[in-house]
């Protein structure tokens, strides 16, 4: 899980 552009992506 990483945070990209303020959204959470698995």
Curated annotation (Swiss-Prot):
Q: Which GO cellular component does the record give, naming just one? A: extracellular region
**Which cellular compartments is it found in?**
Secreted, Cell wall
Keyword annotations = Cell wall, Secreted
Q: Highest taxon of the source?
A: Eukaryota
What is this protein called in UniProt?
Unknown protein 5
Organism (species): Pinus halepensis (Aleppo pine)
């Amino acid at each position: 899980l990483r945070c990209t552009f303020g959204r959470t992506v698995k």
